[in-house]
Amino acid sequence: MSSLRQSEIKRKTNETDISVFINLDGSGISEIDTGIPFLDHMLHQISSHGLFDLQIKAIGDTHIDDHHTNEDVGIALGKAFSKALGERKGISRFGHFFAPLDEALVQVTLDCSGRPHLSYDLQLKAPRIGNYDTELVREFFIAFVNNSGITLHINQIRGSNSHHIVEACFKAFSRAMRMATEIDPRRSDSIPSSKGMLEKQ
């Protein structure tokens, strides 16, 4: 694969102003500032454990709440992943990982199929982690899936601490994405589909 697998997305609305840069073949370097500290912490997990170089800057109406910024970061990051993958030639396509964090264990399975779908099964008992509304975890992944064109299954195997569960989820997600987006040298420039194409629906 000769071309660089990286992309930049800028997205501005009346509610948020977001820029995202990603290098899929990076080393886990990140500069992230969304104005939402817990989301920043989770995005650093994606970069660190996925070995993606990631730069995210977001300015949003967090004086109202975090919903718009959280969702729009998911949108922009999903678009950045999709753009960096291009035609998805040579990728492994499928990824899965179990990540533990103390008592929590979360499984993530995904397919860079071009077919957006989310199955989400986290039981988060705490309404907030710090100041972060735990309902926003699902909203982030919905936004990401719809704009990256992946099929994503998130399953909580066990766990009681909401912070541990969410962090295990993001770590498993990052490793599964790393697995799915890595180049399979046996595929060369071929698209990993019997249809001969993978496109976001």
From Swiss-Prot:
User: What catalytic activity is recorded?
Assistant: D-erythro-1-(imidazol-4-yl)glycerol 3-phosphate = 3-(imidazol-4-yl)-2-oxopropyl phosphate + H2O
Q: In which pathway does it act?
A: Amino-acid biosynthesis; L-histidine biosynthesis; L-histidine from 5-phospho-alpha-D-ribose 1-diphosphate: step 6/9
What GO cellular component is one of the record's annotations? Answer: cytoplasm
Q: What is its EC number?
A: 4.2.1.19
Q: Name one GO molecular function term.
A: imidazoleglycerol-phosphate dehydratase activity
Q: What's the chief localization of this chain?
A: cytoplasm
Task: Give the Pfam families listed for this entry.
Answer: IGPD
What is one process in the GO biological process aspect for this record? L-histidine biosynthetic process
Key words, A-Z: Amino-acid biosynthesis, Cytoplasm, Histidine biosynthesis, Lyase
Query: Organism's domain of life?
Result: Bacteria
Q: InterPro entries, per this entry?
A: IGPD_sf, ImidazoleglycerolP_deHydtase, ImidazoleglycerP_deHydtase_CS, Ribosomal_Su5_D2-typ_SF
Q: Which SUPFAM superfamilies match?
A: Ribosomal protein S5 domain 2-like
Q: Where is the signal peptide?
A: none
Subcellular location per UniProt equals:
Cytoplasm
Q: Which family does it belong to?
A: Belongs to the imidazoleglycerol-phosphate dehydratase family.
* PANTHER family, per database record: IMIDAZOLEGLYCEROL-PHOSPHATE DEHYDRATASE, IMIDAZOLEGLYCEROL-PHOSPHATE DEHYDRATASE HIS7
Specify the protein name.
Answer: Imidazoleglycerol-phosphate dehydratase
Naturally occurring in which organism (per UniProt)? Prochlorococcus marinus (strain AS9601)
Which gene is this protein's source? hisB
